[in-house]
Amino acid sequence: MQAIIECLPKERYSHMPHSKKRQALREAAKTLFYTQGFATVSVEAICTAAHTSRVTFYKYYFGKNALVQELFAEQKEQVRNRLECLLAQQCSLEEAAAALFAIQRESMTELYSAPVLDDIANVADLELERFFRSMEEEKYQFMRSFFHTLQQRKLIHHSLPPELIDLFIRQMDSLMRQPCLAELYAPSPQRLPQDILQLLLYGLTSREAE
């Protein structure tokens, strides 16, 4: 199973290697975004953390928004590639569930921290609002196709209408934004998306992904 989950090494996701200075900016930004969210982090703070100049930053990016979009778009493609690889391996439902949980855990520990999720939910910048809305819709379309493929392979019950599965996937994000759940999961906010995914894959049974 692990071989299927890791069927695409992470280093193969990038189209081209980045220069050392650009990679330093990316890593500094990811660290700052993860701990503080991206909304309040300035270009100056990123440059300071990366030990580089603003001139160097603007050599690679028009502004902070461009860097934000690069990091999130890249992570989106990584997830897409891993799931497409998974389907190509003729995975079982258990393997699909294990991969989804593994990808989600990695996303929550590498990029989608609680401050980042809060910034996405309350984004005020119009450019980033359009970007994240577009990403969300792409995610829905891909996951609809992903679960439809599993259904065609008879891993998901054939009687479930695709529209119901699609609506359930969309409701997962709606649940993430419920204030009462945010309060309930405040001690461990990253547990909420895990429990929601668990509910989607296994319902109310006690079964869990290994």
Residue positions per predicted region:
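Amphipathic, non-transmembrane alpha-helical scaffold segments
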Residues: 68, 72, 76, 129-140, ...
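Hydrophobic alpha-helical connector segments
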Residues: 70, 84-110, 169
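Generic hydrophobic, amphipathic alpha-helix propensity
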Residues: 20-32, 46, 71-75, 79, ...
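Hydrophobic/aromatic-rich alpha-helical bundle segments in the mid-to-C-terminal region
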Residues: 119, 153-197, 208-210
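An amphipathic alpha-helix signature
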Residues: 98, 140, 144-148, 162-166, ...
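Short secondary-structure transition hinges
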Residues: 105-142, 152
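N-terminal intrinsically disordered/low-complexity leader segments
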Residues: 1-20, 208-210
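Helix-turn-helix
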Residues: 24, 32-66, 70
